[in-house]
From Swiss-Prot:
Annotated catalysed reactions: RNA(n) + a ribonucleoside 5'-triphosphate = RNA(n+1) + diphosphate
Keywords attached to this entry: DNA-directed RNA polymerase, Nucleotidyltransferase, Transcription, Transferase
GO biological process entries: DNA-templated transcription
InterPro entries according to UniProt: DNA-dir_RNA_pol_insert, DNA-dir_RNA_pol_RpoA/D/Rpb3, DNA-dir_RpoA, RBP11-like, RNAP_asu_C, RNApol_insert_sf
Subunit composition and interactions: Homodimer. The RNAP catalytic core consists of 2 alpha, 1 beta, 1 beta' and 1 omega subunit. When a sigma factor is associated with the core the holoenzyme is formed, which can initiate transcription.
A GO term for molecular function: DNA-directed RNA polymerase activity
Protein's recorded name: DNA-directed RNA polymerase subunit alpha
Domain of life of the native organism: Bacteria
Enzyme class: transferase
A GO CC annotation given for this chain: cytoplasm
Domain comment, as recorded: The N-terminal domain is essential for RNAP assembly and basal transcription, whereas the C-terminal domain is involved in interaction with transcriptional regulators and with upstream promoter elements.
Protein's job: DNA-dependent RNA polymerase catalyzes the transcription of DNA into RNA using the four ribonucleoside triphosphates as substrates.
Alpha N-terminal domain (alpha-NTD): annotated segments: 1-233
Length: 340
């Protein structure tokens, strides 16, 4: 079976711009990707971040003395419609999954903000300074709001509860903890080649989830959704080990052979020599990206080496513990002298 996915260049880790990182903003870099993968993955992550992450939001409100959203409240500057608009801007974090009821009770003049919402330990207000209403000395405002966990945008009609008390007004809810996502794709260099992609991803949240976790959740969602398209069991990576006689350590003697025995082209052989690679084990320990960074080492040389290693049951990027083993080196040298 062709191992198409192993022949592609991919990043080894996600880099974070620590200087600008906060609980609400993060800037991330990943490189190198094969040409086109930066846009493919950047767009996919952006769409999932904006649409599919769970968050908390207010789904309905009941105001004492109010039967519908087109009413006004004595002593309150804002009408009910404007109060509902302001409630949509309240950012919350829930530590459970069950719906919760929160309240506002206010008498007399003053400005009501999200910090005035009475909650229990399961609900946290993330923007307590957010404006909700302005009251005069004659005001007597009592409100009950239902907070739920959900994802994406849910219109008021879907938040309607037939069992709710009379006067309950369903409202649109934006559950997503993500406020904004940007991504850009620029050129990345691997060795002498500059036609790879560098993905830069910027994420803004409401503070209920940190940007690093948001990106991780989005990637996990994509991974789960794509898994159904894989119709085979992936083969285990070659370990570079082979069983030998009883009482001996399992080794693959090819790892201790000189790279000169690979009979590479002059260009490839010189590149390995300049990189200080003497043994095949040292070669297979290098990743494709590391090899392409070697001076004058290009895709043609890479493919040549990969083909020869494949014939030996080896690949680039292998993890070899305890290599080289001095005891094995001495034993193999002794065997070769005996053969001579």
């Amino acid at each position: 079976m062709y191992r198409n996915w192993r022949d592609l260049i991919s990043p080894k880790k996600l880099q974070v711009e620590s200087e600008t990182l906060t609980n609400k903003y993060g800037k991330f870099y990943a490189e190198p990707f094969e040409r086109g993968f930066g846009t493919t993955l950047g767009n996919s992550l952006r769409r999932v971040l904006l649409s599919s992450l769970q968050g908390a939001g207010i789904t309905s409100v009941r105001i004492k003395g109010v039967l519908h959203e087109f009413s006004s409240i004595p002593g309150v500057t804002e009408d009910v419609t404007n109060i509902i608009l302001n409630l949509k801007g309240v950012s919350l974090k829930m530590y459970g999954t069950e719906p919760k009821t929160v309240r506002i009770i206010h008498k007399g003049d003053g400005i009501i903000t999200a910090g005035d919402i009475i909650t229990d330990p399961q609900v946290e207000i993330l923007n307590p300074e957010h404006h909700i209403a302005t009251c005069s000395k004659d005001a007597n405002l009592e409100m009950e709001m239902v907070v739920k966990v959900g994802k994406g945008y849910v219109p008021a009609d879907r938040n309607r509860d037939e069992k709710a008390p009379v006067g309950t007004i369903p409202i649109d809810a934006l559950f997503s903890p993500i406020r904004k996502v940007n991504f850009t794709v620029s050129n990345a260099r691997v060795g002498q080649m500059t036609d790879y992609d560098k993905l830069t991803l910027e994420v803004w949240t409401n503070g209920s989830v940190i940007p690093e976790d948001a990106v991780a959740f989005a990637a996990k969602i994509l991974k789960e959704q794509l898994s159904i398209f894989i119709n085979f069991d992936e083969e285990a990576e070659p370990s570079g080990e082979a069983e030998v006689g009883e009482g001996e350590s399992p080794i693959n003697e090819n790892l201790y052979r000189s790279v000169d025995e690979l009979e590479l082209s002059v260009r490839s052989a010189n590149c390995l020599k300049n990189a200080g690679i003497k043994l095949i084990g040292e070669l297979v320990s290098r990743t494709e990206a590391e090899m392409l960074k070697t001076q004058n080492f290009g895709r043609k040389s890479l493919n040549e080496i990969k083909d020869i290693l494949a014939e030996m049951g080896l690949t680039l990027g292998m993890k070899l513990e305890g290599f080289p083993d001095p005891e094995v080196m001495r034993r193999l040298r002794g065997e070769r002298k005996d053969e001579e």
